[in-house]
From Swiss-Prot:
Gene that encodes it: dtd
Endpoints of the signal sequence: none
GO molecular function: D-tyrosyl-tRNA(Tyr) deacylase activity; Gly-tRNA(Ala) deacylase activity; Ser(Gly)-tRNA(Ala) hydrolase activity; tRNA binding
This protein's name: D-aminoacyl-tRNA deacylase
Transmembrane segments: none
Keyword Cytoplasm assigned: yes
Intervals of motif Gly-cisPro motif, important for rejection of L-amino acids: 137-138
Subunit structure, as described in the record: Homodimer.
UniProt organism field: Desulfatibacillum aliphaticivorans
Function: An aminoacyl-tRNA editing enzyme that deacylates mischarged D-aminoacyl-tRNAs. Also deacylates mischarged glycyl-tRNA(Ala), protecting cells against glycine mischarging by AlaRS. Acts via tRNA-based rather than protein-based catalysis; rejects L-amino acids rather than detecting D-amino acids in the active site. By recycling D-aminoacyl-tRNA to D-amino acids and free tRNA molecules, this enzyme counteracts the toxicity associated with the formation of D-aminoacyl-tRNA entities in vivo and helps enforce protein L-homochirality.
Keywords noted in UniProt: Cytoplasm, Hydrolase, RNA-binding, tRNA-binding
Catalytic activity: glycyl-tRNA(Ala) + H2O = tRNA(Ala) + glycine + H(+); a D-aminoacyl-tRNA + H2O = a tRNA + a D-alpha-amino acid + H(+)
Length: 146
């Protein structure tokens, strides 16, 4: 499982011009699922991301986690995180999980984050989405379960 995590002042996702998820201060998480991923990876990645100390304390040092700052999370499915561009000019997505597994683990990830006490919004799995954000810092990390 792979995630691109961006610290944001705000983020929003639209489907067909209609807002389906929006947050204020928090994290935008683009989430990709691999074929071998299980609930174990979901649990690990959700806890890791929620606990990342990437928000600034009063001294300007990245020392606080999402829950410590009362932040929110917007989770967007992103199978293209497993795109392989090493051959040719068109990416191959054979490294991404099949849609049925990816959707199941994506929803499980959202549920785990929610159970950790984080207000969570989502995009729409499998839809063409417009994602907008105000990246704060910028702070952008790639977090993987393996």
């Amino acid at each position: 499982m792979r995630a691109v995590v961006q610290r944001v002042k705000s983020a929003r996702v639209k489907v067909n011009g209609k807002s389906v998820g929006a947050i204020n201060k928090g994290l935008l998480v683009l989430l990709g699922v691999a074929p071998e991923d299980t609930s174990k990876e979901v649990e690990y990645l959700a806890k890791k991301i929620v606990g990342l100390r990437i928000f600034e304390d009063d001294n300007g040092k990245m020392n606080l986690s999402l829950d410590e700052v009362g932040g929110e999370m917007l989770v967007v499915s992103q199978f293209t995180l497993y795109g392989d561009c090493r051959k040719g000019r068109r990416p191959s997505f054979v490294g991404a999980a099949p849609p049925e597994l990816a959707e199941k683990l994506y929803e499980e990830f959202v549920n785990v984050v929610d159970l950790l006490g984080i207000k969570t919004e989502t995009g729409k799995f499998g839809a063409m989405m417009d994602v907008s954000l105000v990246n704060q810092g910028p702070v952008t990390l790639i977090v993987e379960s393996k």
